Swiss-Prot record:
UniProt subunit comment: Homohexamer.
Biological function: RNA chaperone that binds small regulatory RNA (sRNAs) and mRNAs to facilitate mRNA translational regulation in response to envelope stress, environmental stress and changes in metabolite concentrations. Also binds with high specificity to tRNAs.
Cellular-component GO terms for this entry: cytosol
Membrane-crossing residue ranges in chain numbering: none
Protein name: RNA-binding protein Hfq
Length: 83
């Protein structure tokens, strides 16, 4: 994965994880999963609800936070947050 992708993904997913924001994750096949992001890496997201599910990022279409989230791309990029 390119560094540019990580400049957006990592701070966004990390803010969702840190703030325990409830999310809806839509998969490419249309299935909707709900829960809180427990952890993530380059390839997967761990989604916790009544159980913890490992969801492969290539299967994710959209992640919708349950509330507004403030995150900064500067967390990952230092002072150069330009895309």
């Amino acid at each position: 994965m390119s560094n540019k992708g990580q400049l957006l993904q990592d701070p966004f997913l990390n803010a969702l994880r840190r703030e325990h924001v409830p999310v809806s994750i839509y998969l490419v096949n249309g299935i909707k999963l709900q829960g809180q992001i427990e952890s993530f890496d380059q390839y997967v997201v761990l989604l916790r609800n009544t159980v913890t599910q490992m969801v492969y990022k290539h299967a994710i279409s959209t992640i919708v936070p349950g509330r507004a989230v403030n995150f900064s791309t500067a967390e990952a990029a230092g002072s150069d947050a330009s895309a």
